[in-house]
A protein has these predicted regions:
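N- or domain-start disorder-to-order transition segments that initiate the globular core
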Residues: 1-26
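M16 family metallopeptidases and their MPP-like homologs
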Residues: 17, 23-43, 60-114, 151-174
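Acidic/histidine-enriched alpha-helical segments
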Residues: 64, 118-144
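Active-site SXXK
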Residues: 43-52
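Catalytic Zn2+-binding segment of zinc metalloproteases
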Residues: 51-59
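Histidine-acidic residue clusters that define the catalytic metal-binding segment
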Residues: 1-7, 157-187
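Glycine-rich, mobile lid/loop segments that gate access to catalytic sites or pores
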Residues: 139, 143-147, 158-162
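A generic secondary-structure signal for well-formed alpha-helical elements
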Residues: 53-54, 116-120
């Protein structure tokens, strides 16, 4: 498995890895951001809102029906961090085309790009308040739940202690106060 790289634009690179070992395919789209206290959680917030719907599939139900049509393909948000930069984006996983009618990969990529480039917006050009509020509620619940999960809490404390003074020590999802202060127009 040797990766190949292709620069599509000055700011967009494509990395592919061909293998016959798996029956599934994976596609990810990510942005690289600096580990800044407000930028990291707000960027994650944006991806959580994007995942709630797009023009073509405006509700979670319609998105899920489309994913079911694609042989139960899955789209999730991911966050990778390192020293000096963080990556945030979508990861799509689907059954390999050789095991289907051959259109699952293309359909999943199309759906992912609809979510990114044709998001569900209100008449002012902002994310809909319903999707922003639902994403905010989910993120805040997730932040609050860390204290009740010993493994997540230990990992959080590890990052805070190990990387004190570095961007990596910042809470990846932010704080409840920060997330509650973010408005739809800021996103």
């Amino acid at each position: 498995m040797i990766p190949t790289y292709k620069q599509l634009t000055p700011f967009l690179n494509l990395k592919t890895v061909q293998t016959d070992k798996f029956k599934t395919e994976r596609f990810s789209v990510c942005i690289i951001i600096p580990p800044e206290e407000r930028l990291m959680p707000v960027s994650r917030f944006v991806f959580h809102v994007l995942k709630r719907g797009c023009k073509k599939y405006p509700t979670q139900r319609e998105l899920n029906v489309r994913l079911d049509d694609l042989y139960s393909a899955a789209v999730s948000t991911r966050f990778w961090d390192g020293i000096g930069s963080c990556k945030i984006g979508f990861v799509a996983e689907m059954l390999g085309d050789e095991y289907t009618d051959g259109s699952v990969f293309d359909g999943t990529v199309e759906l992912l790009f609809d979510m990114l480039w044709e998001p569900l917006l209100d008449e002012k050009g902002y994310f809909t308040s319903k999707n922003v509020d639902l994403a905010r509620e989910n993120i805040c619940d997730s932040i609050r739940s860390v204290i009740n999960n010993p493994r997540q809490y230990a990992l959080k404390r590890f990052w805070e202690t190990m990387y004190e003074g570095d961007g990596c020590a910042l809470p990846r999802s932010g704080t409840v106060e920060l997330i509650e202060s973010v408005s739809a127009d800021e996103l």
